Design a protein with these regions (language model features):
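Conserved glycine-rich cofactor-binding loop
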Residues: 7, 14-16
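Alpha-helical segment proximal to the catalytic Tyr-Lys
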Residues: 123, 172-176, 238
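C-terminal helical subdomain
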Residues: 183, 204-236, 240, 247-249
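Substrate-binding pocket helix/loop in short-chain dehydrogenase/reductase
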Residues: 93-95, 102-107, 210
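Active-site helix of classical SDR
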Residues: 118, 159, 167
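Short C-terminal tail/terminal secondary-structure segment
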Residues: 92, 230, 241-267
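Residue(s) in the substrate-gating loop at a strand-loop-helix junction
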Residues: 143
Length: 267
């Protein structure tokens, strides 16, 4: 098993990618601290069983981040992996309809949250790596919107672009520690955050249009993103550092076009 006896924290573990990742880490032998601002995190931990602990936490609160890491240290004797996944969308308002309070809150959770995770988890992961002679990993959840925002939310897109840059900066500043820092960049994924989009498409008989701009022509499932996070956290990615891995069905590989523009049709 890839994470046998490893100590892992997953934030945003109450639903979506975080829940799928927490379950996947445990299935691979990890002891997991499941953290989320909602009570749903208790269900995730219960699903996993004795290998999991649950804690309510606000990803953008330094006090809560410190408290969550302390739980992992107390329960599991150290920390090997931090998956800083918690985030919020902030809606789809354009620049002119986005007020300072909204963008501040999105940045607090989506960007300051990963910053705090790195700041407080990295020293513990480095300490564990030195003790074991191995390495540790921090994985952040960014977004394809942080690579190429298109017409998306300015608050969300800016926050996720910041996460990508933060992963790169942290990888450099943790030089020599054997702690790797990478980010996953999901495309449209069926989670609690995007549930209204998928539900509307199903009700309207238009589910085939979800994700139509990417070459796979579908949205992702949380388990697919979880597997990407596990890869980056695992020894299989031992030489992958400071990278932003797009897991978006190919959306970011090109500017959005349709075959009709070139006089061709889909195969």
């Amino acid at each position: 098993m890839r994470f046998e006896n490893k100590s892992v924290i997953v934030t945003g573990a109450g639903s979506g990618i975080g829940r799928a990742a927490a379950i996947a880490f445990a299935r691979e032998g990890a002891r997991v601290v499941c953290a989320d601002i909602t009570a749903a995190v208790e269900d995730t931990a219960a699903t996993i069983g004795t290998a999991a602990r649950a804690i309510r936490m606000d990803a953008g609160s330094e006090e809560d981040v410190v408290r969550t890491i302390a739980l992992a240290l107390d329960a599991h004797g150290g920390l090997d992996v931090m998956f800083a996944n918690a985030g919020i969308s902030g809606g789809m308002a354009n620049i002119f309809d986005t007020d300072v309070a909204l963008i501040t809150e999105v940045l607090r959770v989506n960007l300051i949250g990963p910053f705090l995770a790195i700041k407080h988890a990295a020293p513990e992961i480095a300490r564990r790596a030195k003790e074991t002679g191995g390495g540790g990993a921090i994985v952040l959840t960014a977004s394809v919107a942080g690579i190429r925002s298109g017409a998306g939310s300015p608050a969300y897109s800016a926050s996720k672009a910041g996460v990508i840059n933060l992963a790169q900066v942290a990888a450099q500043q943790l030089s020599g520690s054997n702690v790797r820092v990478n980010a996953i960049c999901p495309g449209l994924t069926e989670t609690g955050m995007t549930k209204p989009v998928f539900d509307y498409a199903r009700d309207a008989g238009k589910i085939d249009r979800v994700g139509r701009l990417n070459p796979l022509r579908r949205g992702a499932q949380p388990e697919e993103l979880a597997e990407a996070a596990l890869f980056l956290a695992s020894d299989a990615a031992s030489y992958v550092n400071g990278q932003a891995l797009a897991v978006d069905g190919g959306l970011s590989s090109s500017h959005p076009v349709t075959r009709q523009e070139y006089g061709t049709t889909a195969a």
